[in-house]
Amino acid sequence: MKTFREFVLECNSVQESSLNRIRTKSQKGGTAIVSAERGNKSLAENRARSQQMDRDIRGKGLPGATKVSGRYDERGDDGKTTKVKERSHVVSSGKMGKRKFSKAVKSLGKKYGQDSVLIQKKPGGSASLQATRKGGLGGAKSINVGKMQPGTTGEADTKIKGKTFTYG
């Protein structure tokens, strides 16, 4: 029989394993973070879009995504930026090549009207925000954001089970 202390330690290690799993995937191959949610949509509509994105990710031949929550500065159609919290999907490239993986993730971002998607093509390499619509990144096609940094927060960060990480 476990003591309460052993139980709490086991629960904490389980929470960290998901972040650890994402970090391991990032070190072993390409990963991307993409979302279907928009700040101007209702909660129910955003939830339905996220569920549809799950199906679309598998439909593109990618392995299933890990669901996370993220914060991002979203640029509206009028040019104003607003901070939004959204449900995001961390996708690994699986056996897909770098170029095909990048195109698949960008097409998902375009389909759901996202400003950009975060793509890390090389194992353990630096990631970049890739624009998926005109004006999404203020005119730039891509912005290099750096390597994954678990346990840190920034202006755009991601959280999974209480643990945060960012690229920078």
Task: Tell me the role of every PLM-derived stretch.
Residues 2-66, 164-168:
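N-terminal, charge-rich interaction modules
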Residues 28-31, 85-88, 113-116:
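Short, surface-exposed beta-edge/turn micro-motifs
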Residues 34-36, 92-94, 120-121:
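Short His-Asn-centered micro-motif
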Residues 40-44, 96-100, 126:
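Short, surface-exposed beta-strand/loop "edge" segments at domain boundaries and coil↔beta transitions
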Residues 59-96:
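Short, intrinsically disordered low-complexity segments
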Residues 99-124:
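Short, compact, well-ordered microdomains
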Residues 120-135:
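Short proline/glycine- and acidic-rich turn/helix-capping motifs at secondary-structure junctions
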Residues 140-168:
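A recognition module on extended beta-rich or small alphabeta surfaces enriched in W/G with H and D/E
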